[in-house]
Amino acid sequence: MKRKETYLSRDFRETVALRFPARAKELNTAFDMRLSALLAENADASKEKQYHLKWQILPGISAYETLQRVMPKEEALQTVHGYVERLARTSHKQLAALLYIPGLYRLVPGVFVKSTRSVFGPAAGFDPKELQAGNGVWRVDMMKCPYHDTCTEYGCPELCRCFCDSDDISYTGLHPKLIWHRTKTLGRGDDRCDFCMKVKK
């Protein structure tokens, strides 16, 4: 069965086709083999965690490692960061456009509460400590994160920052009456991610 392409695998293939055409076949094969091995090693992860592993974490690690065959480590990191950033900017545009609907911005903190509980909960390998959920405020301290844990486990903790930055790009400045605030992230070396999205009073 053919594996579904993710935005990371698609962008990786585009990079190698444009920049390393003579080695594109070899690099694509190396990427696919590494990703298959990573997926096999994580096959026993929960369904909830698999969502994050398959969509972003493992393709990100595979792209990062494979690109280092043809470019310096820092350039490989910035290249993968570019893939993640591009998706985040698209996501920001779509969300901001949606929030033109009058009054819709008020619902955003509540949506964050629900998505944290359903997609970013313990079953997926996260450890959220809910500090405030209601009255136009969502505040959560994330004490454990599979993005950070998996990148660290595979010897590339620096890759996690791409995903941390993605949140900031996606959610900063969505609406004049919404405040996205975060001073710490696990991926940047802190002891937690202190998430906050609130309606400006």
Q: Each predicted region: which residue ranges?
A:
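N-terminal, charged low-complexity regulatory/assembly segments
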Residues: 1-67
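Generic structural motif
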Residues: 3, 31, 126-130, 180
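Unusually extended, aromatic-enriched hydrophobic runs near protein termini
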Residues: 8, 49, 99-125, 173-198
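Secondary-structure boundary/capping signal
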Residues: 24, 75, 178-179
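Amphipathic interaction/junction segments at domain boundaries or subunit interfaces
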Residues: 55, 66-155, 159
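C-terminal non-catalytic interaction appendages of large macromolecular assemblies
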Residues: 136-141, 146-150, 154-201
